[in-house]
Every structure is written in structure tokens, then in C-alpha cells.
UniProtKB/Swiss-Prot annotation:
Its main location: nucleus. The keyword Transcription applies. It is found in: Nucleus. Residues 1-15 have a biased composition (Basic and acidic residues). Residues 1-52 are annotated as: Disordered. Belongs to the BRMS1 family. Residues 16-51 have a biased composition (Acidic residues). This is Breast cancer metastasis-suppressor 1-like protein-A. The gene is brms1la. It comes from the Eukaryota. PANTHER family: BREAST CANCER METASTASIS-SUPPRESSOR 1. The keyword DNA repair does not apply. InterPro entries: Sds3.
Length: 323
């Protein structure tokens, strides 16, 4: 709108210049009659000034009108843009805007994919934990079984040793039991005759070297029993008994040397397949995994691991052979 007002002013100036040129032309033509028309020229100049002033006021009014229209249009455009922004904001807040729905759909798709992956990972973790639990349970049960067998063998060995010692004590005490019974019988006789006069013992005449016992009869019996036990322990009878018991217990020749097992004339090493046989049970196939000083670890076909003690092989509780 300022451009239009400038063009308007230029057109007014051109018109004024044209009028001024015409006036100069007319004045040149009437130079000869200049003196006679002085009054007429004064009146025409006054009319030109009034016309210029009037045109100037019209231009100013037109410029003011154009500026007002421009301001109104600018306000109207601002309000329309503001209404558009408010409408778009309302669509976003209500969840209907395209700029909001497209990224939202992408986020929902990503969420579904990640949720599915997390579910699969959860199932795999649960399966892994379950397998680990089953493995630990099976290992604990097998360890309990092996420890139970070992404890049973240990207790049985201790009880057999105690029984053997009691039998030896019984055989060694039989000799002194007669003296013990005689002592008790003599005490009973003394209690039966409390009013009998005390008989004086005659001094015993001993020839040669002799030992004077200053102990009581019970102390002598205890010492005699201890001597008999020591003699039975160190005597040939005890040696024969120990040898026979060891021969009875060690029915098989079994030992471990340098990471290998020697059993009944055959050598067994790690990684060899063997067959384990126990009384009243079916034979089991296994593979040797570790051979220690006093135990042998093996792995069954089902993957479970167990161990055998060399003492169990020596006693014949288990037998092994090459598969």
C-alpha cells in the first residue's frame, strides 16, 4: 500500500508539470499581449494552487485508507493463523492429529516387538533356571546316596571292630572271671558269719625271692586283666586273627596309582567304559571321569555322576570290568 501512494504522488506531479508546460506554452504564445492579460494570469495561478492542495489532500486520504486496510488485513491474517494453530493443538491434545498418530503407531509397534522379545527371553530364563534346579537336585541326591553308603560302610566297619574287640575281651576275661567269682564268694561267706571269731592268718614261709603284694584283690584283678589284654594284643593269636580278618575283608585287590586304577589284575584309566555290578542290582554302564587316591568318579549313560571308594572295591561290595 505505500507503493500505491508513491505512484499516486508521482502521477500528481506529472499532471502538475504538464499543466505548467501548457501554461508556459500559452504564455509564450501570448507574450505580445502580456500586458493586457496580467489580471487573467493571476487568477489562473490561484486556481492551480488550490487544485494542487486539493489533490494533495486526496492523496493523503487515500494513503491513510490504504494503510488502514493493510492493518486490517494483517490483523485478520494473524487471527486466522492463530485459529489454525489452536485447532491443531486441540487435535494433538485429543489424539487426532496426523503428526501425532503416525509416530504413536510406530512407538506401539516397537513396544509390541520388545514385549514379544521380552516374553521369549523370560521363557528361556525360566527353562534355564528349571534345568539348573533339576541338575542341582540330582547332584545333591547322588551325593546323599554316596555319602549314605560311605557312612553305612564306616559304621559297619566300626561296629565289626567293636564286636571283635569285645570278643577278644571276653576270651581274655574268662581266665580271670574264676578269681573274680572266688573273691565274691569269699565276701559272701564273710557276710554270712558276722559273729564268727577272726582267725589269725599264719605267716607264710617263702623260700627264695618273692614278691609282697600290697594291693587289694580288686586292684590285682584289674592289673591282671590289663596284662592279659596286652598279651592277647601282642601275641601270635592276635596276629593270626588280624591277618585272617584282613583277608576276609579284602576279597579283591584294588588300588590307585598315578591316576589309574588297578583292580583284579587289570588297569583302568580315565575315559574308559566300564560295567559296574552290585549285589542284588542290575549292572550299570558308565565311563570313568576321575581317579583319585581313594575314590573313582564315573558318569552314567543318563549323565549323572557318582563315585566308588577303593575300599568298596576291595571288600567286594562293587565289582567293575571293562565294557
Amino acid at each position: 500500500m505505500p507503493v500505491h501512494s508513491r505512484e499516486k504522488k508521482e502521477s500528481n506531479h506529472e499532471e502538475m508539470e504538464v499543466d505548467f508546460a501548457e501554461q508556459e506554452g500559452s504564455s509564450s504564445e501570448d507574450e505580445d499581449t502580456e500586458s493586457s492579460s496580467v489580471s487573467e494570469d493571476g487568477e489562473s495561478s490561484e486556481m492551480d494552487d488550490e487544485d494542487c492542495e486539493r489533490r494533495r489532500m486526496e492523496c493523503i486520504d487515500e494513503m491513510t485508507n490504504l494503510e488502514k486496510q493493510f492493518t486490517d488485513l494483517k490483523d485478520q491474517l494473524y487471527k486466522e493463523r492463530l485459529n489454525q494453530v489452536d485447532a491443531k493443538l486441540q487435535e494433538v491434545m485429543s489424539g487426532k492429529a496426523a503428526e501425532y498418530l503416525e509416530p504413536l503407531a510406530t512407538l506401539q509397534e516397537n513396544m509390541q516387538i520388545r514385549t514379544k522379545v521380552a516374553g521369549i527371553y523370560r521363557e528361556l530364563c525360566l527353562e534355564s533356571v528349571k534345568n539348573k534346579y533339576d541338575c542341582e537336585t540330582q547332584a545333591a541326591f547322588q551325593h546323599w546316596e554316596s555319602e549314605k553308603l560311605l557312612l553305612f560302610d564306616t559304621v559297619q566297619t566300626e561296629l565289626e571292630e567293636k564286636i571283635r574287640r569285645l570278643e577278644e575281651d571276653r576270651h581274655s576275661i574268662d581266665i580271670t572271671s574264676e578269681l573274680w567269682n572266688d573273691e565274691l564268694q569269699s565276701r559272701k561267706n564273710k557276710k554270712k558269719d558276722p559273729f564268727s571269731p577272726d582267725k589269725k592268718k599264719k605267716p607264710v614261709v617263702v623260700s627264695g625271692p618273692y614278691i609282697v603284694y600290697m594291693l587289694q584283690d580288686l586292684d590285682i584283678l584289674e592289673d591282671w586283666t590289663a596284662i592279659r589284654k596286652a598279651m592277647a594284643t601282642l601275641g601270635p593269636h592276635r596276629v593270626k586273627t588280624d591277618a585272617s580278618s584282613k583277608i576276609d575283608k579284602l576279597q579283591h585287590n584294588a588300588r590307585s596309582e598315578d591316576g589309574r586304577l588297578f583292580y583284579d589284575g587289570e588297569w583302568y584309566s580315565r575315559g574308559q567304559a566300564i560295567t559296574i555290578d552290585k549285589k542284588d542290582e542290575y549292572p550299570t554302564s558308565a565311563v570313568i571321569t576321575t581317579i583319585n587316591h581313594d575314590e573313582v568318579w564315573f558318569k552314567r549313560v543318563d549323565g549323572s555322576k557318582s563315585k566308588l571308594y577303593v575300599s568298596q572295591l576291595q571288600k567286594g561290595k562293587y565289582t567293575v570290568k571293562h565294557a
